[in-house]
Amino acid sequence: MSEPFIFIGSYQVKPGHLEEARHRIREVSALVEEREPQLRSFHFYLDQARKRVICVQIHPDAESMATHMAVVANHLATAGDWLELGSSTQQVLGVPPAVLTDYARKYNEDLDSYSIFVAGFSRDVTERAMR
């Protein structure tokens, strides 16, 4: 069994673009929910100052992240309209797929990578709660 792939990205919202950010985040969340049934978890949070947004994604494997990058390609292409892309911090847990490392290199973003799985487990709490 392969280990999950986890992505955590934090981004600065451009001044005056908070409502646009909220709208776009809700749009991409709906798109991902509809088109990526394999994704285990996909959440956005704002900090207290409402200046930074963080995205936490839990994929069943790295291939799911590659699929995700294709699904959200149009969203990523316009994210610079409302996010300060140079302000991002990104952490990946697991071996990142080439499409993610290529994207980070293209946009000069650092990936803080923890690629060596040591131990752990996942539970599908949604499925259990529905029984």
Task: List each model region and its residues.
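A short, acidic, amphipathic alpha-helical segment used as a generic capping/interface helix at domain edges
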Residues: 73-77
